[in-house]
A protein has these predicted regions:
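Ubiquitin-like/PB1-type beta-grasp interaction modules and other compact soluble beta-rich domains
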Residues: 1-84
């Protein structure tokens, strides 16, 4: 997974499997290519995922803001916003 050399990058977005019953996706892993300066939120939008569903991102077990700019080849775990009642 490497960018194409023209200022782009490719990352993998990993979404919770439970979302597959609500959204028509072929897999819980989505590979997306975007510009080098794309944030996690930008990449979620480029992958046409429902951005309002995800509020937490993790890379290598470390939490990152959706405004974080991931590096080429990184795997980003997306998690829903936790709500209590």
């Amino acid at each position: 997974m490497t960018g194409n050399g023209s200022g782009s990058k490719t990352v993998v977005l990993k979404i919770p499997r439970s979302f597959l019953r609500y959204y028509r996706l072929s897999s819980d892993v989505v590979q997306v290519q975007g510009p080098e300066d794309a944030t996690i939120l930008d990449l979620i939008r480029m992958a046409e995922l429902p951005e309002v569903e995800f509020g937490i991102a993790a890379i290598n077990g470390e939490r990152e803001y959706l405004s974080y700019t991931p590096k080429d080849g990184q795997v980003i775990e997306l998690h829903p916003i936790l709500m209590g009642g």
